[in-house]
Each structure stands twice: as structure tokens, then as C-alpha cells.
Amino acid sequence: MSYGSITFGDVAIDFSHQEWEYLSLVQKTLYQEVMMENYDNLVSLAGHSVSKPDLITLLEQGKEPWMIVREETRGECTDLDSRCEIISDGKMQLYRKHSCVTLHQRIHNGQKPYECKQCQKSFSHLTELMVHQTIHTSEEPDQCEKFRKAFSHLTDLRKHQKINAREKPYECEECGKVFSYPANLAQHGKVHVEKPYECKECGEAFRTSRQLTVHHRFHYGEKPYECKECGKAFSVYGRLSRHQSIHTGEKPFECNKCGKSFRLKAGLKVHQSIHTGEKPHECKECGKAFRQFSHLVGHKRIHTGEKPYECKECGKGFTCRYQLTMHQRIYSGEKHYECKENGEAFSSGHQLTAPHTFESVEKPYKCEECGKAFSVHGRLTRHQGIHSGKKPYECNKCGKSFRLNSSLKIHQNIHTGEKPYKCKECGKAFSQRAHLAHHNRIHTGYKPFECKECGKSFRCASYLVIHERIHTGEKPYVCQECGKGFSYSHKLTIHRRVHTGEKPYECKECGKAFSVSGQLTQHLSIHSGKKPFECNKCGKSFRFISVLKAHQNIHSAEKPYECKECGKAFRHATSLIYHDRTHAGEKSYECKECGETFSHASHLIIHERIHTSDKPYECKRCGKAFHCASYLVRHESVHADGNPYMCEECGKAFNSSHELSIHHRVHTGEKPFKCNKCRRSFRLRSILEVHQRIHI
């Protein structure tokens, strides 16, 4: 076929009004460019005068091409199994001309009848062959004189010149965006106003019928576009195209500031705003700004409470589709992201990139004040607030201030009592999502953070950091009153209350106040009388699981914690810590009434009851009251029948285990109470106290 016999109708593509609506604004603009180029190519190659088609006239005037009314017979594509972007909802694709049907069907049958005689490469369309053949000509590359840019094809040069020469006189009054054609401006205007296409499933509205069609696929689970490499399917062709670059590894878009490369141009544009600091999309409610418009849209739903994306499994709603997709992987078990180091798979890219061990993390962001380094710049920024002391976020309920807005929001849940994050396993609720995530590891047993010193594993990184201080002996949090050091800040906060006398946790039943929330929790069980934790050996019940565990060691007789000074062994690590203070002579807890000092806060609390005459532990048999619970337990054995605690050495029986322990010293010769004046030792504290009067 000679080029002279080609007409514009052979290389033009026609759209009906319905077809035109399926196209996005980008696709419409591309169509206009291609048609104008095809016409220019035809004029250039034909070598004689070609009459200007109506389609070109309309495009030059900025009118929409579907307005042309043709008389030709209509044809239709019957390949309903195709993955053609335009075909949707099971409808046939209609064409006005049989020639257009023939060209379209080559997409499905793979037919490429036009072959290059130079290199034997085949093409579906004659115009593609014509453009390709210019590669083999000996012509010098075409160059734009204005920009000194060279092109291998004349069509590429013409396209470049049109882009740079074209005026854009049509400006949007809403956002100021400019367009070359009024039709493009009219189409763009719908962004700000019309959304005539509404989804009957969820009520979400769209500007075009095509957007609605694509949206329907999410409800029906339709994913017609499948990757031939890995089999993953997508509901939109564009997502398949983006996905395929994962397999090729191609990242053609490079940042000219830092050299980082991206698979998509959109990804590069978003990245570049990091360097410029530009955040053009601002929320009118709270003033927060975003780099991407989609992030602003998602953020606005926080104010409106809208959660349009609902999980069909559990009914949970989400503000954006990505959150729903991540959530649904809980049920499907999908884990698309695999670590090349150890083969471990993850359900999200964030989990994959999150550090598994502290060794693997690069920390390029260093604080100039203290030298601490961070893997993420945002963490450095937050850390620097510690040095500046600024706390700009104040709670309007209690006046407490915070460095971070997120910390304020979490704090406010204390006043509202809101705990929106609930565990599906046990029903326990949390005020923070992170706390729920950590809690979930109790059920799964997942402990990814391992200590290199002793091999002990932990559910979260912060627990490991605190644990490592046992090996290093580091106590970075120091009390300014007494100089005592602590391994983490929470212990220092509680310790300070010893000096200030602050007791913020009050019992609503009796008005008693406590310095630690855990003490209040323990105290409340006195009023309820509940003892839900029962020993399976002897049937004894306890209010707390920790006390039950301590009790069970009696049956096992195991004492794994040994004192390095004297060799004495203990069932609990805390007991060993308290015992160590005996050797060190450390008594940091002082009574404000009489000045007596104690090695443990609990001993001070019990001692203070002497001054207040507080005896909260009452015997239900005789009504006698005691300062501490252990005295009550010992007393209750008086009412019990028999003496259940028998000495294995001599057979003597006692009412309580405490009395038996004291008796054992007769056989062992143990005298733990030493006089600091003359170094004489005694079996009982009371005998030591009598002895010390000699030295007064």
C-alpha cells in the first residue's frame, strides 16, 4: 500500500459520547495530541494537499470530538474476555466504522500485518510502521532551535515544539490552573462541582461514569488486570503498569537534589517537596498542611468522622482504602513483602522496612546536643524538643503540657476514658493503637527483640532497651533530691512522690490515696473481696497473679536468685534487690514524722501507719486490726485448727510459715541481724533491737 492512498480516516480513532466519558482528562489530552500529530504526519508524508478533516477542526477549536455525527455503519467488538481498558460492566465496545473494529481487534488477536523491510519488526498500525522507518533513514536528528534539544523523530520534535509554544488562555477561577482548550477547562471544572455518578452500594459519588465503573470493582472484588510475572491482579490497569516496574527494577525518575530514584514520576514529585518544604494542601479546620492532596482528603475524614471503607468480615470502618487493604490481610493471611536477608514475609511494606534488630538500622540523623542518632529525621526533630524544653501542646482539662500533639491526644483519652482499640482475643481495650499492637504479641508469643548478652527476648524495643541497662548498669534518670539513679524515667517519676508526698490515685470507696496506680488497683480488691487466682496445688486463692506465682514457688522450693555477698537465695528477683540493700546499708526512704529510714518504700508505708494509727487489715473472726497484711495472715493461723507447718528436722509444728522460717535458724545457725556497733549477730530482729540499747 502506498502512502498516497492513505486517508485520515484510516489512522483516526473515533469515540462516542459514552466512550469519551470513560476517558480521564490525561487520556483525553493525549488523544488530542495524537490525532493532531497523525494529521501532521499524513500531510508531511503524503506530499500533496490533504483536506482538513472535521475532527481536526473541532480539536483546534477546543471542542469535544464525540460531537461529530457520522453516517457509517456501526461495528462492534465481541471479544468480551479482553482486558481492554475501555470495556467494562460486560458491555460490548461499539465503533462507528468497521475499519476501527478491525484495528481494535488486533489488540486481542495480536495481529501485526505491517512489517519493516529493514529490520523485520512488525506493527499493528501503518502509522506505527511509518514513524518507525524514520529510524533507518540517514537524516540528521531534528533539533529544537529554541532549547537546543535533539530528537530522533520529526513527530517528537513537533510534539516538543507544540508543548512549549502552545498558549494556555483558559484559566480555572477556582484553583488558577490553565488549559489550552476550553473543553479541557470544562472537564476540569467538574473537579470542583459536579459528581453526578453515585455508587448504589455505598453512596460515594464520582465525576465520571468511568470512575464509578472502576469503583464498582472494589465492591465486587473484580480484578481483571493480572501480572504475568507473579499472578497478582489489579482492578485498574494503571496499577498493573506501576506494579510491573517492581519486577524490572527500573527507576527512571531521579531527584536532582539527592540522587534518589523512583519508579513513578508522581513519586519523584512527592519526594521533591521534602527538599522544598512545600505543603500546598491545607486543612481549613485545623490548619494542618500536606504535600499531597490525597493526604488532605484522608485527613479531613478525621474531622467529619467519615469512614467510607468498611471490612465485610468484621464491619470495621476505615478513612482510606489503603488501611482497609492492610486490615483485610489479617483474614487473608497475605504477605507480599519478603525480606531478602532471612526470607521472613510481611503483610505491609512498612513492616518489612521496620528494623528487626538494632544492628541493622542505619542512623544518619545525629543530634548536635547529645550525639544521639536516629534512623528517621522526624524522630530527631521530636528528640530535639527534649533539649529545648518546649511543650506547646496544653491540655484544656488539667493544664498539662506536651512536646507532641500526638502525646496530647493520647493524654486526653485519660479524661474521656476512651479506649477505641480493642483486642479481638480477650476484649481488652487500649487508648493507643501501638499499645494494642504490643498487647497482641502476648497472644501470638511474638518477641522479635533479643538481648545479645543473655538471649532473652521481648515484645517491643523499649523493653529491650530497659533490660539492657541491667547488663550495662546504666541508670540515666537521677533524682535531684537524693541522687538516686533509675534505669527508666517512669521509676524516677514514682520515686519523686516519696519526696513530694504526692498521692494522685485515690480510692473512691474509702478515700485512701496512693502514689502508684498499681497500689490503688491492689487496694480495690480488698473492697471487692475477689481472689480469682487459685493455686492448683493447695487450692489457696489470691487477688493477683503475681502473688500466685510467688506462692507457687513454695511448692517447687526453687530459689533461682542468689546473693553474691552471702549466698542467700530467693524466689523472686525483687526479693534479691531488697536483700542487696541490707549489705549496702542503703535506706533512702525516710519517715517525715520521726526521721527513721528504710530500705524499701513498702516498709516506710507500713511504718507510717504507727503515726496515723491506720490498721486497714481486720480479722473477720475476732475483729482485731493490723498495720500490714502479713501480721493479719500470721494472726489468722491462731484461729486455724492445728499447726500445719512442720519442721522436717525435729518435727515441731507451727501456725505460720513465718514462724517455721524463724525456727529453721535454730538448726542452720543463721543469724541475719548484725549489730553495726560491735558486729555481733542475732537470729531475731527483736533481740538485736534489745541488744542495741546497750550501746546507747
From Swiss-Prot:
Protein name, per record: Zinc finger protein 607
Keyword vocabulary terms for this entry: DNA-binding, Metal-binding, Nucleus, Repeat, Transcription, Transcription regulation, Zinc, Zinc-finger
Gene Ontology CC annotations of this record: nucleus
UniProt organism field: Homo sapiens
Zinc finger map (C2H2-type): 114-136, 142-164, 170-192, 197-219, 225-247, 253-275, 281-303, 309-331, 365-387, 393-415, 421-443, 449-471, 477-499, 505-527, 533-555, 561-583, 589-611, 617-639, 645-667, 673-695
Gene: ZNF607
Family from the record: Belongs to the krueppel C2H2-type zinc-finger protein family.
One Gene Ontology term of the molecular function aspect: RNA polymerase II cis-regulatory region sequence-specific DNA binding
Domain KRAB: 6-78
Presence of keyword rRNA processing: no
Subcellular location: Nucleus
Function: May be involved in transcriptional regulation.
GO biological process terms on file: regulation of transcription by RNA polymerase II
